[in-house]
Amino acid sequence: FVEKHTEKEAFGIKNSYANVQKMGVDRWLAMVCAAEKSKKAFFVMDVGTAITVDFVVDGQHLGGWIVPGFQVMRNALVASTKKVFANDEIPTTFGVGTDTEDCVATGCHAALYGVYLSAVDYISSKQTEFDIILGGGDKKVFAFLKSADNMRLAHLVMQGLARYARSELLKGTST
């Protein structure tokens, strides 16, 4: 059993949080995973109930965003409005809806695509060459994206945790 906590610095990443315990360990592990997959600047996007985006340039965590995931966004819209309904479908292509259910799904999809495009714009303003590390249980929300040379898919939290475990094993064998 391995238990990890967010750290101020590890694996060449310096955390920007003044109080690192306020950062969820899932975000930290996602960055640890991403740093192993990229030797360039990167942003890591973990897509699930919430979508987290964190930016790292030259080993320095610049900060990030936390936004509602697709399901949360859709459910909040349905719960907060009358006569707006949704289905359980997640669009696999980018487009527009032709009935209320599709409009809710494609609208939430477009909002999340806006987060992705904003992340690309932000990191582009900091570094011209960068990688995009994408993972999470709902990463299929971004299935329509063309796979670019600078995009990597990962099981972020598990691979970040595995990186810590390998490091601990190496420490144990060197003593």
Predicted regions: what they are:
Residues 49-51, 140:
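Gly/Ser/Thr-rich loops at beta-strand to alpha-helix junctions
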